[in-house]
């Protein structure tokens, strides 16, 4: 069949091309094309005729593909192609392009059907590129924009604002097809340089989308777009048919007119003809579209730098950086006149007449429409949810005629307050805006301006010809009160905490905070003195992420000034090291810049997010507050060798020193305090001294147990022995720091029982109670260690004066209520007295006992929650009734195969009815299935609000588990940031009952970066299986469960749901080595970017668990989770689950102060996983969480003076 192709001269002629195998031809005469010669008539006709629209789009794509194929373009690498075959039985066969050779214009392909076929010449044999749709980019799939992530605060649903309709006058400019060279440059700068990423959930990728149908135009002229589906306009939705402004006088080219970046302007430099610009209706000019926006504002004063302050500009931007960033667009004759500003456009009242400033973060800015700056109201798109009421959007400074005129006349620099696509086409576009400009699919929505990487970051300026150019970037000293207030410990911002909680949090994570500060200082010290550090202002609802490893960027990072590509400190350091050594950086590939230019480390710009020196000022306040409250500091800052390692001065402050010949370094920098902050204590300051009337009376050899026994007789004083305070250096954090010598200064302090029982973990010698709990009394008969970490035994020895031999005779599971010590918490012990089980989920004292075991890294169980829940909400019938028609993916637990095309109802039908389950194709046997990711993502709260409320109202230990819990550090993250997804998440699966199923796991061995509370809300005993109880009992016994657990099943008649095996986080490396050893024995490979634990590819059955203990000495906790049990799993603890019956479990994640160190380490581990790994992305933002938790804690503590006179002795928080 003949296919008609558009020529390059317009629609005046049609070229028929015959392909191999086609036998029919269809010709279209010129007369039939007359009705669509007029552009506006073409718009209307194509909008109504979707078939013609799709044909045009398909032809353009095919034309582009042919050009790339005939040239052997390397951009086709990874693309699926069809190759014509002369064999009549197989007319086409599929292959994958693995290499392109532009010199020989051939393609190297990989064909499974004909392995011998390696080289294809598209000029000799017909080759077609396979497209799933017109918005895919090779093999890459993109859920969202590469770097930025929207906040869930505005709701989960994202809707596009409806657009009003208006008419446009006829155009006299003919429509021309896109030149191949232009399209190639477009795809080269964005498609080939932008790999896929799954880090965003709201901005789909469209890299191979066809560009606009338009002519080559001289700079300053503008074409008129077709409707929305070809050039993002052939859309069935009722939208405004927009025209483009005549900007010849202003020298401004609207980015909507051209989909090419600044690097592509050379292609458009030759004029092909003149364009007559149509005028838009005045009604359209005055129509303003009201759209909601995220509430994030700058101060009322606008961030504009006047050119009269020449010294300030020179000081803010280094000459080398200025030379690289300035982009002066060449303009043709007649374009140098300054634009005339026409009144009649609504003015902004938020800025004064003398100062022009950007709009609020997240504002919906408008396009420049004409010389009179008419606004294209429909070009804006909001990412806000309809559920959130937000103030009207503030407009860009460029949309105000008066302010625009003043900016052009004065040449003042101002901050970019709109996305790149809404400014001008001459300026380099960031990566997000280049992708946004190429989207053509009607279902894809444009990003809000806040997702532009240069939004409120890049500074712009009009030159003397009235052409907009890049002036530089914001610097750290250009902050305002609102920007700095987000990072300072202000008491007015602290809610949901108290003094005791603040002290406990600071005692646990203060050292980690100091290590973050030292790591930032060390990274800052590597920056050359002559290089200017830029400041990237935090944007509400946007999470800055490394484009290489997907880790959340905390503060210092490196940014490409041309496209906004950003990398974290670790990736930059590794890349630079490999470049110096001549090695290839194989861990992760760096995406390319505009026009496929390589990102070299030396061309990137150091950038910080925290304004000014706030990070270092808060670090000083932390030391001051800890000394003020007697909170011991075991951080490296406590050593005097770091005393001079103070806050680095800003680069502006270093210029004077560099000019005088001095070489500044961190050891010689003068400490400078921010005027916003009070003077802080010097690092290494000793903690506050105890009262002078306190005298230590205990001998040096007093045992911990004897000291604790003295508590009941009133002897509460004890002298601390000299200790060597060491802090493990975090992996990949501060490698360059020298080793820390021990501190030789002794600290004589007093302890109360309350302060000691609640002591956080600092080191191995940190507390008498911890030493007692960690003591070992040998091995039992079966060879397993019996470590009596029993609070009951300790309390009983105090109250009842029992000896250790008497304690061993006490029956297991005996509940003791030592009310004299302040604990009245019903509980018992499982796993041979190694697992605490709390019996009353609503007891107010639970967290006191829980915390002592939790800080040891032990799991904890709470029983009886099902009595508090609304059971009707959690039955399978309710889920089937509400969601039975939803399509989901199922996983076969025996084979790990994914079953698609099923519904939620299919799963619930077999939940308690074995014969009604889905059957496999071969044996026709019922499968053991689990629901995969349902409800999907973060939809639990929105999809099941009543169940969410029921769970949150009854989940135990709310201080930790609720989103606003005072000991849940994730609650300290301000709403300004993207909140981490901490659940709840549902886990629904059938039971594995048969003996053969004991080698399978419902969830294989893995670990999580955060703590978790897993609630068993329903246990379903299926019908149709015999001898279920006997098989379940054997599985429990085979799983190494203790006698008390078995009694719960046999005598207590409780419903067992799942068998857990949990291991201590400290044993992770041993388990990893063991699994690698076993995999090598089985002939399996161990790739560098994969991990046997993170890959969830192993389930440890009885034989493997036995080998693990015998060869590595690793013993875990075997826990049977009954109906109503809540299992608390510490962060970083490897664990696996085997369902005994059909179970419905709900898990809520949280971040506890006790386990932040594991979050730190795991974040570094996840960086080295493959980019397709589910745990690869740093969703927790652990550094941001730590910073703001410490910030709030010191804000609370520095505002209150400790009243030591009200207590008998000073409680020393350690």
Swiss-Prot record:
Cofactors demanded by this protein: Fe(2+)
Residues in coiled coil: none
Subcellular localization(s) per the UniProt record: Cytoplasm; Nucleus
Positions with biased composition (Basic and acidic residues): 371-380
Gene Ontology BP term (one): regulation of stem cell differentiation
Reaction(s) the record says it catalyses: N(6),N(6)-dimethyl-L-lysyl(9)-[histone H3] + 2 2-oxoglutarate + 2 O2 = L-lysyl(9)-[histone H3] + 2 formaldehyde + 2 succinate + 2 CO2
ZnF start-end (C6-type): 546-571
Residue numbers bearing the N6-acetyllysine modification: 779
Annotated positions binding Fe cation: 1006, 1008, 1135
The protein's assembly and partners: Interacts with VRK1.
Function, as annotated: Histone demethylase that specifically demethylates 'Lys-9' of histone H3, thereby playing a central role in histone code. Preferentially demethylates mono- and dimethylated H3 'Lys-9' residue, with a preference for dimethylated residue, while it has weak or no activity on trimethylated H3 'Lys-9'. Demethylation of Lys residue generates formaldehyde and succinate. Involved in hormone-dependent transcriptional activation, by participating in recruitment to androgen-receptor target genes, resulting in H3 'Lys-9' demethylation and transcriptional activation.
Domain notes: The JmjC domain and the C6-type zinc-finger are required for the demethylation activity.
Family designation: Belongs to the JHDM2 histone demethylase family.
Name of this chain's protein: Lysine-specific demethylase 3A
């Amino acid at each position: 069949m003949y296919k008609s192709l558009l020529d390059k001269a317009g629609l005046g002629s049609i070229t028929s091309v015959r392909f191999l195998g086609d036998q029919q031809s269809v010709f279209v005469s010129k007369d039939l094309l007359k009705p669509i010669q007029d552009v506006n008539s073409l718009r209307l006709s194509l909008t109504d005729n979707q078939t013609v629209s799709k044909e045009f789009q398909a032809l353009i794509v095919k034309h582009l593909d042919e050009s790339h194929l005939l040239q052997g373009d390397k951009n086709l690498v990874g693309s699926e192609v069809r190759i014509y075959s002369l064999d009549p039985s197989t007319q086409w066969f599929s292959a994958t392009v693995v290499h392109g050779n532009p010199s020989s214009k051939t393609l190297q392909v990989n064909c499974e059907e004909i392995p011998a076929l390696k080289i294809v010449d598209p000029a000799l044999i017909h080759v077609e590129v396979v497209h799933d749709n017109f918005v895919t980019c090779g093999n890459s799939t993109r859920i969202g924009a590469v770097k930025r992530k929207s906040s869930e605060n505005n709701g989960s649903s994202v809707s596009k604002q409806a657009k009003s309709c208006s008419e446009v006058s006829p155009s006299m400019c003919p429509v021309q097809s896109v030149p191949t060279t232009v399209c190639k440059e477009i795809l080269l700068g964005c498609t080939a340089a932008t790999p896929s990423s799954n880090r965003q959930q709201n901005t789909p990728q469209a890299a191979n989308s066809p560009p606009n149908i338009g002519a080559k135009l001289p700079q300053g002229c503008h074409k008129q777009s077709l409707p929305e589906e070809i050039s993002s306009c052939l859309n069935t939705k009722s939208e405004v048919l927009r025209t483009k402004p005549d900007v010849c006088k202003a020298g401004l080219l609207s980015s909507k007119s051209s989909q090419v970046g600044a690097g592509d302007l050379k292609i458009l430099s030759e004029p092909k003809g003149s364009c007559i610009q149509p005028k838009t209706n005045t009604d359209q000019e005055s129509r303003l579209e009201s759209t909601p926006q995220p509430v994030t504002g700058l101060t009322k004063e606008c961030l504009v730098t006047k050119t009269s302050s020449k010294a300030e500009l020179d000081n803010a931007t280094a000459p080398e950086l200025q030379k690289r960033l300035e982009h002066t667009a060449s303009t043709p004759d007649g374009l140098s006149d300054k634009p005339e500003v026409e009144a009649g456009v609504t003015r902004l009242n938020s800025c004064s007449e003398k100062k022009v400033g950007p709009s609020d973060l997240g504002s919906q800015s408008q396009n420049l429409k004409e010389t009179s700056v008419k606004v294209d109201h429909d070009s804006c798109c909001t990412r806000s949810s309809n559920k959130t009421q937000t103030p009207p959007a503030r407009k860009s400074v460029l949309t105000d005629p008066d302010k625009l005129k003043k900016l052009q006349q004065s040449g003042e620099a101002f901050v970019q307050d709109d996305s790149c696509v809404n400014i001008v086409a001459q300026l380099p576009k960031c990566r997000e805006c280049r992708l946004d400009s190429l989207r053509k699919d009607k279902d894809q929505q444009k990003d809000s301006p806040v997702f532009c990487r240069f939004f409120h970051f890049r500074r712009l300026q009009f030159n003397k010809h009235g052409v907009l150019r890049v002036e530089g970037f914001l610097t750290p000293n250009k902050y305002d009160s609102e920007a700095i207030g987000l990072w300072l410990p202000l008491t007015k911002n602290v809610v949901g905490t108290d003094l005791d909680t603040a002290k406990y949090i600071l005692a646990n994570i203060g050292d980690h905070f100091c290590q973050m500060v030292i790591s930032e200082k060390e990274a800052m010290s590597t920056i050359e003195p002559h290089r200017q550090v830029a400041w990237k202002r935090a944007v509400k609802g946007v999470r800055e992420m490394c484009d290489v490893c997907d880790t959340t960027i905390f503060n210092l990072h490196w940014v490409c000034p041309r496209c906004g590509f950003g990398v974290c400190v670790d990736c930059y350091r590794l890349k630079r090291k490999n470049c110096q050594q001549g090695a290839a950086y194989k861990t992760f590939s760096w995406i390319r810049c505009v026009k496929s230019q390589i990102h070299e480390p030396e061309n990137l710009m150091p950038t910080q997010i925290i304004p000014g020196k706030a990070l270092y000022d808060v670090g000083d306040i932390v030391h001051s507050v800890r000394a003020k409250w007697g909170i011991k500091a075991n951080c490296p800052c406590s050593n005097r060798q770091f005393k001079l390692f103070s806050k680095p001065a800003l680069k502006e402050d270093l210029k004077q020193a560099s000019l005088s010949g001095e070489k500044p370094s961190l050891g010689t920098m003068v400490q400078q305090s921010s005027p916003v902050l009070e003077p802080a204590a010097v690092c290494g300051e000793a903690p506050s001294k105890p009262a002078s009337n306190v005298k230590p009376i205990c001998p040096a050899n007093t045992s911990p147990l004897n000291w604790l026994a003295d508590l009941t007789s009133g002897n509460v004083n004890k002298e601390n022995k000299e200790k060597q305070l060491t802090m493990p250096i975090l992996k990949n954090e501060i490698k360059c720091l020298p080793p820390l010598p021990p501190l030789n200064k002794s600290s004589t302090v007093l302890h109360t029982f309350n302060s000691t029982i609640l002591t956080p973990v600092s080191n191995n010698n940190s507390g008498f109670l911890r030493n007692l709990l960690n003591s070992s009394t040998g091995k039992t008969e079966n060879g397993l260690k019996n470590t009596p970490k029993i609070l009951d035994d300790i309390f009983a020895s105090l109250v009842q004066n029992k000896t250790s031999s008497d304690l061993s005779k006490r029956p297991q599971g005996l509940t003791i209520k030592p009310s004299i010590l302040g604990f009245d918490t019903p509980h018992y012990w499982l796993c041979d007295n190694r697992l605490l089980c709390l019996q009353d989920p609503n007891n107010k004292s639970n967290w006191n006992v829980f915390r002592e075991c939790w800080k040891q890294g032990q799991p904890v169980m709470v029983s009886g929650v099902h009595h508090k829940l609304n059971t009707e909400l959690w039955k399978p019938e309710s889920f089937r009734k509400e969601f039975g028609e939803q399509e989901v993916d199922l996983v076969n637990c025996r084979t790990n195969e994914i079953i698609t095309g099923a519904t939620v109802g299919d799963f619930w039908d077999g939940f308690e009815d074995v014969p009604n389950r889905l059957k496999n194709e071969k044996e026709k046997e019922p499968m053991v299935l689990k629901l995969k990711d349902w409800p999907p993502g973060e939809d639990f709260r929105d999809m099941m609000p009543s169940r969410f409320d029921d769970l949150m109202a009854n989940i135990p230990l709310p201080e930790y588990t609720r989103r606003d819990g005072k000991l849940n550090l994730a609650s300290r993250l301000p709403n300004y940031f993207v909140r981490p997804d901490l659940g709840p998440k549902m886990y629904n699966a059938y039971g594995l009952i048969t003996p053969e199923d004991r080698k399978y796991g419902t969830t294989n061995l893995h670990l999580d970066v955060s703590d978790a509370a897993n609630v068993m809300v329903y246990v379903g005993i299926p019908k149709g299986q015999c001898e279920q109880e006997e098989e379940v009992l054997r599985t429990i016994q085979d799983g190494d469960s203790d006698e008390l657990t078995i009694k719960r099943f046999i005598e207590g008649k409780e419903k067992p749901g799942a068998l857990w095996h949990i291991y201590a986080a400290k044993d992770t490396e041993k388990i990893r080595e063991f699994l690698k050893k076993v995999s090598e024995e089985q002939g399996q490979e161990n790739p560098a970017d994969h991990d046997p634990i993170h890959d969830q590819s192993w389930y440890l059955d009885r034989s493997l668990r036995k080998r693990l203990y015998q060869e590595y000495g690793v013993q875990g906790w075997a826990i049977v989770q009954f109906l109503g049990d809540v299992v608390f799993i510490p962060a970083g603890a490897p664990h696996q689950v085997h369902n005994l019956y059909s179970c419905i479990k709900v898990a809520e994640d949280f971040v506890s102060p006790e386990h932040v160190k594991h979050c730190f380490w795991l974040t570094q581990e996840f960086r080295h996983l493959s980019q397709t790994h589910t745990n690869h992305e740093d969703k927790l933002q652990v550094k941001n969480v730590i910073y703001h938790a410490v910030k709030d804690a010191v804000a609370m503590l520095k505002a209150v003076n400790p009243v030591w006179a009200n207590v008998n002795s000073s409680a020393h928080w350690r």
